[in-house]
Amino acid sequence: MIKFKCTIYFFFILTAISNAGENFRNIEIKGKLTCIISNGVPSHDIGRFPNSANPNSFKKQKLNFCFPTIPQLTEKVTWGLMTVGVSISGIPIRPYTAEYFDSNGKRGYSRNPASGWRKQAMYLPRSLGIDQHNGHVDKSGLYHYHSVSKNKVPQRSDLLIGYAPDGFKIFYNPNKATSSWRLRSGTRTAPPGGFYSGEFEQDFEYRVQSGSLDECN
């Protein structure tokens, strides 16, 4: 489970493509900001890209993620961010996809958000060419994570895996943290129709205090 606070401050991502190489990550303090600078190369082997479900080739990047050194909570929740965090190795965390249900689109999806039903990356991860670390490559060659790969991280409590845009730490704690987002029951009342299966983000609803985490976790 990815754990992050509700209030998103800001997240600068400066990117330019360069040649592939070894992992590089540096942390710098710039005034009131902490910046994680990386070349976009993970600290582990990645899957084969391109592959049958992902036509994109991996490319080394120049990434600069900056966030408040001292995070502050506010009363406002910010929605709609694609990048919700950066790993401690300097790789973006992007749980969402850019694909929506579209009866006229290829394989029933397109980048047109008109339907309001956004595809969940981890419902059928291999359909997006996601590798064993739950990451893949976008059109720019940027490798990013869609989820924590529980089989690839140490199984201990309160494992720091990264930082959110507001500066709060992101922990992986599967034994203590439980989500308050639940799969809806019944069937969808609008296209795409069918049972709530978890294929789309909108298949889930937030149920207050049904788990230990709030709506932003």
Feature locations, PLM:
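Solvent-exposed N-terminal domain segments of exported/luminal and surface proteins
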Residues: A20-L124
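Domain-length functional cores that host ligand/cofactor binding and catalytic or interaction surfaces
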Residues: G135-N217
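Bacterial N-terminal signal peptides that target proteins for export
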Residues: M1-I8
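Hydrophobic h-region of N-terminal signal peptides that target proteins for export
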Residues: F11-N19
